[in-house]
From Swiss-Prot:
Assembly description: Disulfide-bridge linked aggregates.
Family according to the record: Belongs to the gliadin/glutenin family.
Function: Glutenins are high-molecular weight seed storage proteins of wheat endosperm. Thought to be responsible for the visco-elastic property of wheat dough.
Keyword terms of this UniProt record: Disulfide bond, Repeat, Seed storage protein, Signal, Storage protein
Protein name, as recorded: Glutenin, low molecular weight subunit
Keyword Endoplasmic reticulum carried by entry: no
Organism: Triticum aestivum (Wheat)
Positions of region (Disordered): 20-179
A Pfam family assignment: Gliadin
Organism domain of life: Eukaryota
Keyword hit for Disulfide bond: yes
Length: 356
């Protein structure tokens, strides 16, 4: 009996396997006919949805092992196996295949193909072939022309601006720079050190007088001029070579300032004398009416523009430095480096300054 039951079960299992194989052989054409579009268009979902059931259907030994105990109940096996095949395959092909064609294929053609043609092709053709960019470029060119027309006047106006700005730079920057070169600033210790040179140059600031002094110094070696000359040369040699030129200019500038102070004192004395004479000449009855012309006279006598004073100082400085640089280096056998100045010297006075 047991062997008969075993053979019967084996026969049933073989029959069910043959039925399943026949059904599977009939199903692949549908899957082969319908899988390529799904594999081409929707491979991931179709492979996930259909391969899993086929793998479950092909793996019969576990299914047979799980359902071998209920093989004794043949009707449930047919009821359990047949309905799933009818319910699993037909709904899958009806629900999974038909909707994909209607929902998955049609939308891709409508969403994937049509939008690309509408979004990818039409915009590029509209952007590349349409005339708005050309019109924008033409508008930009048309706008650039007014910009060039608007910018050309500033460019044409900029040269006068540069012409207007350059003179102030020449007037504001260069003179101070030249003044910084021309009006030297040196420590009082150096001035004290070169005081003999200052005294020597104060006595002989005129070229003719300097030549006379040099002649006298040659004739009378023990004179005051010769003593001051020796002291000046000694002090000048102690100063570094780079600062010798500036120190000489500083000495000359101090001489010019002393001369101006003396001139101002003389002018003030003359002004005071003229005011006293004017007051003595005017009658006392005029009272306050006399005070106004007196103030005007004081202002007229005291007014001297600073620019004229500076120009006069610079001219004197250049003339006297040229004379000093001709005499002192040769007299003391001292090297004085070249020092360029930007100011113009009056005609007839040559500045032959070089490296001695």
């Amino acid at each position: 009996m047991k062997t008969f039951l075993v053979f019967a079960l084996l026969a049933l299992a073989a029959a069910s396997a043959v039925a399943q194989i026949s059904q599977q052989q009939q199903a692949p054409p549908f899957s082969q006919q319908q899988q390529p579009p799904f594999s081409q268009q929707q491979q991931p979902p179709f492979s996930q949805q259909q391969q899993s059931p086929f793998s479950q259907q092909q793996q019969q030994p576990p299914f047979a092992q799980q359902q071998q105990p209920p093989f004794s109940q043949q009707p449930p096996i047919s009821q359990q196996q047949q309905p799933p095949f009818s319910q699993q395959q037909q709904p899958q092909f009806s629900q999974q295949q038909q909707p994909p064609y209607s929902q998955q294929q049609q939308p891709p053609y409508s969403q994937q193909q049509q939008p690309p043609f509408s979004q990818q092709q039409q915009p590029p053709f509209s952007q590349q072939q349409q005339q708005p960019p050309f019109t924008q470029q033409q508008q930009q060119q048309q706008q650039q022309q007014p910009f060039t027309q608007q910018q050309q006047p500033p460019f044409s106006q900029q040269p006068p601006i540069s012409q207007q700005q350059q003179p102030p730079f020449l007037q504001q920057q260069r003179p101070p720079f030249s003044r910084q070169q021309q009006i030297p600033v040196i420590h009082p210790s150096v001035l004290q050190q070169l005081n003999p040179c200052k005294v020597f140059l104060q006595q002989q600031c005129i070229p003719v007088a300097m030549q006379r002094c040099l002649a006298r110094s040659q004739m009378l070696q023990q004179s005051i001029c010769h003593v001051m000359q020796q002291q000046c040369c000694q002090q000048l040699r102690q100063i570094p070579e780079q600062s010798r030129h500036e120190s000489i200019r500083a000495i000359i500038y101090s001489i010019i300032l002393q001369q101006q102070q003396q001139q101002q004192q003389q002018q003030q004395q003359q002004q005071g004398q003229s005011i006293i004479q004017y007051q003595q000449q005017q009658p006392q009855q005029l009272g306050q009416c006399v005070s106004q012309p007196l103030q005007q006279l004081q202002q007229q006598l005291g007014q001297q523009p600073q620019q004229q004073q500076l120009a006069h100082q610079i001219a004197q400085l250049e003339v006297m430095t040229s004379i000093a640089l001709r005499t002192l280096p040769t007299m003391c056998n001292v090297n004085v480096p070249l020092y360029e100045t930007t100011t113009s010297v009056p005609l007839g006075v040559g500045i032959g300054v070089g490296v001695y």
